Amino acid sequence: MKTCLTRSLAVIGICLSAGTAMAADVYSPMAPEVQQTTTETGWTFSFAPYFWAAGLSGDIAQFGLPEAHVDASFSDIFDHLDFGAMAIGEARYGPYSIFADVMYTKISGSAGTPRGILAVEVEVSSETFAGLLGAGYSIYEDNAARIDLVGGMRVWSVESDLSFSGGILDGVSRSDEATWVDGLAGFRATYSITPEIYLTGWGLVGAGQADLDWDVAAAIGYRFSDTISAVAGYRALGVDYSDDGFVFDVVQQGPILGLVVRF
């Protein structure tokens, strides 16, 4: 029971945070806007809280436990979620852009052990942070389309705590954590079908402390006004990281929904 709970909560925590992450529309860091309204200084800004209904599949290992294959559905997440926050911000000046994507989640749960000898109950909590900071440059632009070349660094940080109550291990606790950084590069693009409706997407790939880190998405958006727009689509993100018994080799994918405010 302890092993299953530990693995389950670790998967759910990383699944919620990973990312990643980028469910905004063409005003977002991962999808450039062709018709943004500039300020008097020439800068444009956008902020986009978003929601990514991502499931997760792959292999993980924490707390020195054997590597396990996992397949966590999205319905498992809300049973253990304590707090979650995801948002994107971008500043653009002409063909240049600077963007950030931040995700943080905290999850927890508990369960009784099968025999109650080593412990009567085990509690697990996990905090996960994932942040991407990058820059872009428009390599093509016309009245309907724009293509940006982008690059950046993504930081992952995962910390899990395990506490035992009752039995031989009463009062014993253990922590496991990992932090790593990857560099990514790729493209983002948008195409306006009408003044209100547009298509957008991106593709990033890289590595660093992870052997592989990649992120792709496609979406359709709708502009309600000059300051408010929304987007819906699908995103997939994969990362392959392992170090000193900590393994995170997974693919996360699912629908995205975002609301963008421009100022």
Predicted segments with their positions:
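Short glycine/proline- and aromatic-enriched beta-strand/turn motifs that initiate or cap beta-hairpins
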Residues: 22-104, 258, 262
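Residues on the lipid-exposed face of transmembrane beta-strands in outer-membrane beta-barrel proteins
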Residues: 47-49, 87-91, 133-137, 151-153, ...
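Solvent-exposed loop/turn segments connecting transmembrane beta-strands
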Residues: 79, 143, 181, 204-215
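Predominantly the C-terminal beta-signal and adjacent terminal strand-loop region
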Residues: 212-262
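Bacterial N-terminal signal peptides that target proteins for export
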Residues: 1-10
